[in-house]
Amino acid sequence: MSCTSPPRAWAQIDTNALRHNLNVVRRVMPDHRLMAIVKAEAYGHGLEGVVKALDGEDCAFFGVATVAEACRVRDAGAKTCPFILGPCFEGEREEIVQNGWRAALSSMEE
């Protein structure tokens, strides 16, 4: 007898609803650039799937926490630039610059 159980809960992501919600925000704030936050696996909704659904929808950036997440956005084929919200290690700075990504600065050294 197996001691594993199938998942009892899951999320089904409606990509049309994601795009609709983005457009609602855009209508409310027409003069602002929008960043779709996809850090932490798009808050459990699947980073790659959300990126693919929203890429091309005129988001200014995809907000990620780390360089590793920025790589996942790139590897998903996104044209939209990742914006790294978390602190970066010194060894990651060159990769950020080479890829043309944006990053928040958390210290003067960065």
Where are these regions (language model features)?
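Active-site-proximal beta-alpha core segment in soluble small-molecule metabolic enzymes
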Residues: 2-5, 9-13, 17-20, 30-110
